[in-house]
């Protein structure tokens, strides 16, 4: 036991059992978003979005995605667990609508999850229910359970406006951004 009452030495890595990947302090030019999926239901998956950067882990928002499916159904299935690059997408309908909605000073491109096997155009955007996901990741400031009724997240635009600028600027500055999806909800059971 060290002087802080812990059973590990300061130079050892910290491991949080059952919560996915070890907490890793990232390099100054790298950030990793982490989606901890905690509740699967018939039509939706609820999660928590964290940012891992040079200063550790920070909670950003609640998330909502489509449900888990063994066989993909277009725009009705959450993406597989794993780590993916995120880039800015500056074409397409969502990009045009967000330019109109938020203006060019704010909106620099959609946060686009890259190279997901069997999926295209996976974006991080606003919305409240699984009907708004189209297979993408929705972010919000509030969350309601999806056990006895359909999943719902609220204040989505507020959350997006809070987290988007720093992530978009990070990417615009040429830094690396990844996102890791962790299935803590164990949907296969």
Specify the residue positions occupied by each region the protein language model found.
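Cell wall/extracellular polymer interaction/catalysis modules
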Residues: 5-177, 182-188
């Amino acid at each position: 036991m060290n002087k802080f009452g812990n059973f590990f030495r300061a130079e050892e890595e910290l491991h949080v059992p059952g919560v996915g990947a070890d907490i890793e302090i990232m390099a100054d030019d790298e950030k990793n978003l982490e989606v901890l999926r905690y509740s699967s239901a018939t039509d939706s998956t609820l999660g928590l979005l964290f940012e891992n950067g040079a200063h550790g882990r920070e909670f950003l928002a609640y998330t909502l995605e489509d449900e888990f499916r063994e066989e993909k159904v277009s725009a009705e299935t959450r993406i597989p667990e794993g780590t993916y690059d995120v880039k800015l997408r500056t074409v397409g309908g969502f990009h045009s609508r967000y330019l109109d909605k938020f203006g060019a000073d704010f909106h620099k491109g959609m946060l686009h999850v890259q190279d997901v096997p069997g999926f295209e155009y996976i974006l991080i955007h606003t919305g409240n229910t699984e009907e708004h996901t189209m297979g993408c990741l929705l972010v919000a400031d509030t969350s309601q359970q999806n056990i006895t009724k359909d999943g719902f997240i609220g204040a989505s635009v507020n959350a997006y406006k809070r987290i988007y600028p720093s992530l978009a600027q990070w990417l615009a500055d040429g830094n690396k951004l990844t996102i890791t999806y962790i299935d803590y909800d164990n949907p296969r059971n």
